[in-house]
């Protein structure tokens, strides 16, 4: 257990220092390739002359098959890597576990991608900001003004504090890199298949629901950790308002989980997030999150990242403390 704690800490440090360099092949991209491969072969109507109801049921069943195939493949490969590494010697096992933990987390990657939006807005203006933010959000960015671009970037940091940092960290603390990568597989399936359009309405439904389930508890833990971060993060954050907006607006989203950390971030920064957005040429009505106590500005992207980092350090500290307590009882 002691070696697992060392690997867990080392993986977090590697994530903070190295992040996700594009020249290093990332396992999540391999998972995405598997999902794409299965999607092309399973999500089709060819050969079916059934009623629409039966066809939709078939799509749903195929989506379930895809999900379990991806989860099993991810689980099996992760186990094999660790077994082989630890069979060489203890040091190889710890190194493998640390590297896998590093690639599960996305703390620095989230900061780098969102700060590109900040840099673009600060140096080149709104058009450059639109191009930068289009790389990290799914909405139509061509209609966004500077406030809209900033809001999209802040929302991405807030939501992905849970999905990309805290949730995978918690699952890795509980079940090692194997469970961490299984979580990443579920999260990747949701991001690729969880659309409410004709192609994925039924085929991607199981993946989307599974993602809601695995994120239900971590999203709420993330929110409370972020509230704590707002209280200890200095005068730029309003901890009391973060808690107030969280209690009021944490369900102002179609997903039961997404507004948990978004509401905390909105309250901590004293800005208003969410609201209507354009996706694939269609206006999607969304509730607002937070109160517009001041106008949002591109500096809020930097503040949101600071809040995310403090939250990540809190989670790492508490996770290591919890793992150490378990070790002491063994």
Locate each region found by the language model.
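Hydrophobic alpha-helical transmembrane segments
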Residues: 1-181, 186, 194-330
């Amino acid at each position: 257990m002691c070696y697992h704690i060392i690997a867990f800490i080392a993986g977090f440090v590697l994530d903070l220092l190295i992040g996700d360099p594009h020249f290093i092949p990332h396992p999540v991209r391999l998972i995405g390739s598997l999902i794409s491969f299965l999607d092309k072969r399973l999500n089709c109507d060819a050969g079916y002359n059934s009623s629409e109801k039966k066809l939709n049921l078939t799509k749903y069943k195929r989506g379930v098959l895809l999900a379990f195939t991806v989860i099993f493949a991810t689980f099996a490969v992760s186990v094999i890597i660790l077994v082989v590494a630890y069979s060489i010697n203890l040091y190889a096992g710890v190194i493998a576990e640390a590297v896998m933990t590093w690639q599960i987390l996305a703390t620095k990657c989230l900061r780098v991608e969102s700060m590109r939006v900040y840099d673009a807005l600060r140096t080149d203006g709104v058009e450059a900001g639109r191009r930068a933010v289009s790389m990290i959000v799914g909405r139509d960015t061509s209609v966004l003004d500077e406030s809209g671009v900033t809001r999209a970037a802040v929302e991405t940091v807030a939501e992905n504090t849970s999905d990309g940092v805290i949730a995978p960290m918690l699952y890795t603390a509980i079940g090692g890199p194997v469970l961490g990568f299984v979580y990443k597989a579920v999260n990747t399936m949701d991001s690729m298949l969880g659309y409410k359009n004709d192609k994925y309405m039924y085929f991607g439904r199981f993946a989307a629901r599974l993602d809601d389930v695995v994120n239900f508890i971590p999203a709420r833990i993330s929110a409370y950790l972020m509230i704590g971060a707002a209280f200890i993060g200095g005068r730029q954050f309003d901890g009391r308002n973060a808690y107030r907006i969280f209690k009021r607006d944490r369900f102002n989203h179609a997903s039961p989980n997404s507004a948990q950390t978004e509401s905390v971030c909105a309250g901590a920064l004293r800005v208003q997030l969410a609201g209507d957005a354009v996706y694939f040429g269609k206006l999607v009505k969304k509730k607002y999150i937070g109160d517009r106590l001041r106008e949002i500005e591109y500096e809020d992207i930097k503040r949101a990242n600071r809040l995310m980092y403090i939250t990540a350090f809190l989670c790492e500290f508490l996770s290591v403390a919890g793992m150490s307590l378990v070790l002491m009882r063994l």
